[in-house]
Amino acid sequence: MHGLLLAGLLALPLNVLAHPTESHSSGISRRAIDITSYRLPQISKYTKSDAVPKQDDESFTTSSTGDDNVSSGDYVTTATDWLKKTLPKATYRLVNDHYIGDSGIGHVHFRQTAHGIDIDNTDFNVNIGRDGKVFSFGNSFYDGEIPKANPMVKRDFSDPVNALQVAIQTLNLPVTAKPENVKAKPVEGKENFKFEGTSGAFSDPKAQLVYLQKDGGLVPSWKVETDIGDNWLLTYVDANKNDKVHSVVDYVSAAEYKVYPWGINDPTEGNRTSIHLPWFKTLSTDWHIDGKGWYSTTRGNNAIAQENPTGGPEYENNYRPKSPLFIFKYPYSEAMTPPSSYRDASITQLFYTTNVYHDVLYILGFNEKAGNFQVNNWNKGGVGGDFAILNSQDGSGVNNANFATPPDGQPGRMRMYTWNASTPERDGCFEAGIVIHEYTHGVSNRLTGGPANSRCLAALESGGMGEGWSDFFATAIRLKAGDTRATDYTMGEWASNRPNGIRKYRYSTNLTTNPHMYVDADGLTSVHAIGTIWASMLYELLWNLIDKHGKGDVTKVRPVLKNGVPTDGRHLAMKLVLDGMALQPCLPNFVQARDAILDADKVLTQGSNKCEIWKAFAKRGLGVGAVFNPSKRTGSNELPAGC
């Protein structure tokens, strides 16, 4: 769910093998339905910090108290006033996911409304600087004529049960909803329902009446939510006639432990070792406690890991290893077969890798307020109740992985498959890059557009960047002490048994090895192909910052920060990319995401890395003169003055 985007389905993050993904359970047939034609339009605008109008009016300054409580801090009021001044005729609601990030920037998100109904693909995000003024903002509000008739008064919209049936039939969903059996039960909110009496979905489908901004107008629509495992869909069905699907969003985008330690990507890079008490002691808890009790198994505050051979929705009662002494040491070798013979080692590895990554990201700013995955948020903000569900050896497919990301407060779900391109087959849990790739889908979807909005990477180029961010973090984390900018890396090489990995090119700073440029995105319809271009740019950024600041001690797991700034170039690049996600608008494009990274550096280091960032992007055609157009992009190698 890339933001309820399942990194799966038509854009399975690691499925670029010659043969299609095999599926043994639920999901949309790849041959029958192509939901890419239903993508949301890319209409967001981002006003970077340099372009924000001067704020002389005292009404747009606040005291920077550092307190992100709405009742005592003014940053939400400042953001609201800015929206009123920018779009005085707009009606809207405040989304309840605002927070002050660890860089000191306040992030506030709004949703446009009409007649009290959400216009679901309209967002306005305001970033408030430490000085209390507007730092930057994004906007995709509808600026056309609002329908005069209030559908809530006339009740001239269709039955939500019919909308559910249209979604099922149009998308060929494996859900049964017979009219005589299905009841639409009202839940909290205007025209908001949960369907009872269906079968085939992982949870009861839902529907909410919304407007959708499309083709220059507003279309009343039922937003039908169906979780079918491989896909977690928001299907926008015409609410007037129930005869058309307007758009589709998919949320799915992919003690002591004997494991491949952090930094070892796969069995070709090192050996399994015993790791004792690996969690960061200054964080809230260790990995096996959630405030309610201790779990002597692969369960805790951040994640719950288990096998899932059937590929079904149940997980709480599935098998997971237990150790009263919290010693999770189980046999594994590449020669072992079948995979079920080493399920304990697989589950333990998945639990370990995910928890370490959670802790690293926490230090870099992806914490409770920012929408991370935790059952207990320890009164530090955000919405709890949402650890990551980790399914090892998931039986719903092979040769792939995916991650479903609903909004903050609902658990994310990772499905890790086995790969059959080798003999014996291989388990993706033992390739850290795949696990990190999938979990990063959860990160990018929670940060972009705010933790409560999981559809902000649903446009084609936005979704491509989602794949690129996932590849970037997986690659940055596996760097070795002897690596230089001449070092190239693949993705998915071990699991897929392909020497060149599963991307078109290796990640490289050499333009012969990897010639990708910004304009290569023209004509592409695959988020993974677009993502490789974005990740190639970020790989350039990574090495520019490492060359300036060093890569630090790569044998150390915990990032080292001084005054909130990573002291090495590797973690600095990761931090700037994370902060950029929180700044950029909903449904961003390459140009906007680049500007957000530059703005992130301006906040974090007062712009001291401006030229390193510009040189990275300009090298691959995203320089000063680059212009986004979905059909014909304009490339540029131009650098700003002074660089």
Swiss-Prot record:
Active site, renumbered: E438
Composition skew (Polar residues), residue ranges: 60-71
Signal peptide (from-to): 1-18
EC main group: hydrolase
CDD domains tied to this protein: M36
Prosegment residue ranges: 19-254
Region (Disordered): 47-71
Keyword Oxidoreductase set for record: no
Subcellular location: Secreted
Domain of life (superkingdom): Eukaryota
Sugar-modified residues: N271, N420, N510
UniProt record, GO biological process: proteolysis
Required co-factors: Zn(2+)
EC number: 3.4.24.-
One Gene Ontology MF term: zinc ion binding
Annotated positions binding Zn(2+): H437, H441
Record bears the keyword Iron: no
Cofactor binding annotation: Binds 1 zinc ion per subunit.
Record's compositionally biased regions (Basic and acidic residues): 47-57
Cellular component per GO, a single term: extracellular region
Keywords, alphabetical: Glycoprotein, Hydrolase, Metal-binding, Metalloprotease, Protease, Secreted, Signal, Virulence, Zinc, Zymogen
Entry function: Secreted metalloproteinase probably acting as a virulence factor.
Similarity remark: Belongs to the peptidase M36 family.
Protein's UniProt name: Extracellular metalloproteinase 4
Gene name of this polypeptide: MEP4
